[in-house]
């Protein structure tokens, strides 16, 4: 994980190759180098954008999937255009939910929250659990606005796939729950993170994240790139 607030930096260092979904402008080291694979597609201008849906709209349309009901102070923009390929578009859709599910676990202060475990398995699940637990210990969660862009998705014949994408955390911060204090930090090069995820389609037809690597300050994710 990257993008850690100062207080949580040391704790999150143990969450190797897991999700980086925290405050703006953190300075910690990377937990893995993202492998740039077939990917530098230009994101559309505010296409596919979305805010956190209200509770009545936030449940997945597929029966049996967990509801992702997030606090109203969290919002998301996904500049991920549909590809027209059924499986690739399913990876994009499930990846949106996997990102939000980690934030939900933080909001619920539950390192074993069912929603993120539904969308993560193996190494990715273990890393996410450690990351979430660091927030639970400090009674903190994330707040603000996240933007995702420059997505490149691939599917293999063995029901595995990959998704490489950028995250803009310039308007995302950590909030401490006891007094609702928000740790606002300046936007820097490190506010932009490149992710490389490995996914597997499980027996429920869900594309679950099995491994996630990240690179903070990636040149490819900078606003001028």
Question: Language-model features: where?
Answer:
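Phosphate-binding/catalytic loop of phosphoryl-transfer enzymes
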Residues: 63
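Bacterial N-terminal signal peptides that target proteins for export
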Residues: 1-11
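Core segments of small alpha/beta cavity-forming domains
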Residues: 66-141
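Bacterial signal peptide processing site
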Residues: 25-28
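Structured, amphipathic secondary-structure segments that form assembly/contact surfaces
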Residues: 111-114, 118-224
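C-terminal motif of bacterial Sec signal peptides marking the signal peptidase cleavage site
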Residues: 20-23
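Post-signal peptide N-terminal segment of mature Sec-exported envelope proteins
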Residues: 34-60
């Amino acid at each position: 994980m990257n993008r850690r607030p100062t207080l949580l930096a040391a704790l999150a260092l143990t969450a190797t190759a897991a999700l980086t979904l925290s405050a703006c402008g953190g300075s910690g080291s990377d937990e893995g180098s993202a492998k740039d694979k077939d990917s530098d597609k230009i994101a559309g201008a505010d296409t596919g954008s979305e805010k956190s849906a209200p509770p009545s709209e936030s449940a997945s349309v597929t029966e049996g999937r967990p509801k992702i009901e997030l606090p109203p102070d969290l919002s998301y923009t996904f500049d991920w255009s549909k590809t027209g390929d059924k499986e690739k578009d399913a990876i994009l859709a499930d990846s949106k939910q996997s990102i939000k599910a980690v934030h939900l676990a933080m909001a619920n202060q539950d390192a074993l929250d069912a929603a993120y475990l539904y969308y993560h398995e193996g190494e990715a699940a273990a890393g996410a659990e450690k990351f979430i637990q660091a927030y639970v210990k400090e009674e903190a969660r994330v707040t603000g606005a996240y933007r995702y862009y420059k997505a490149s998705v691939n599917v293999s014949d063995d029901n595995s796939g990959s998704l490489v994408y950028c995250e803009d955390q310039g308007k995302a911060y950590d909030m401490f729950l006891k007094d609702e204090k928000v740790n606002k930090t300046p936007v820097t090069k490190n506010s932009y993170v490149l992710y490389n995820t490995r996914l597997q389609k499980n027996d429920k037809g869900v594309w679950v994240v099995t491994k996630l690597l990240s690179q903070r300050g990636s040149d490819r994710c900078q606003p001028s790139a």
